[in-house]
Swiss-Prot record:
Pfam families: Queuosine_synth. Transfers and isomerizes the ribose moiety from AdoMet to the 7-aminomethyl group of 7-deazaguanine (preQ1-tRNA) to give epoxyqueuosine (oQ-tRNA). The gene is queA. The lineage of its organism: Bacteria, Pseudomonadati, Thermodesulfobacteriota, Desulfuromonadia, Geobacterales. It comes from Trichlorobacter lovleyi (strain ATCC BAA-1151 / DSM 17278 / SZ) (Geobacter lovleyi). This is S-adenosylmethionine:tRNA ribosyltransferase-isomerase. GO terms for cellular component: cytoplasm.
Amino acid sequence: MLVKEYSFTLPDELIARYPANQRDGSRLMVLDRQTAARSEIAFSQIVEWLRPDDLLVLNDTKVIPARLFGQKETGGRIELFLVEPVGDACWRCLLRSSKRCRTGQSIRLAEGVTAEVVEQLGEQDWLIRFHGSDDFESWLQRVGQMPIPPYLNRESEELDRVRYQTVYASESGAVAAPTAGLHFTQELLERIQEKGIRLARVTLHVGLGTFQPVRVERVQDHVIHRERYRLPSETAAAVTETRARGGRVIAVGTTACRTLEYAADNAGHLQAGQGEADIFIYPGYRFKVVDALLTNFHLPESTLLMLVSAFGGKEFILSAYEAAVNRQFRFYSYGDAMLIV
């Protein structure tokens, strides 16, 4: 199976660089795998496609303002991109500056905080220790910039602090948003629950790997990135109960989908716990837990498009993407959504 089979042409003007005026004001394409039917509705009408006893599984990760700007001892400007915490006051970071960094270097940041370059882990990958902040997370919220995707081709703005975050985000740690969840408002979630649909949560801290291109020719040769996850026992129990009642397990986003599938055994039984998920789902994979999938429209040749193709069927999904382009759907993180049932 070749990566180029997942290519498609997307006009630049269909990349959504800003969110819709209202979270649930985006469009929703509904794909029925049984009938091969395709429908188009407003996202706020998603309730019509959900049934009592369904279970909606949300990823409650919270995007951190991971971009920091500082000054080296020489006066040069440097950017730090926080990737993941490593022990006490240390983070794995990507460093970008005009000149090479060195171990032991000190970087001046906002509000008197400094960053010490401890160790080089990769070409731009460094271990950084922060000094001078008693409450690092609060400091980061004040001075950091939101890590919006590079394909938006703009700097982050104040609106991104709110809109590049789901309304139910609670567990800090992601450097990219679980974008399928961006469409929900609190009011819409309440309407969903009033219909007898339950909500459950998982946490998967979306990492930088979500933006990394696939650089091999054959899909099966790609090595997927690892991401930290947590599956609560309450969610595992809710999935079991939903199945027993004949309801559907609906994953809100590829991250919730990957978490559920990674934590399941071959019989579909979930193991509650936490760890690092590195499951790569592409056509040929047999889904063990997820019955329906809500997702955004993804990049050509991306692992996310491969996952969606595995769930909906490659030809069906690619034809839906062609229709989405023709119908002027908005693509990527701030774009429209697709529900596959």
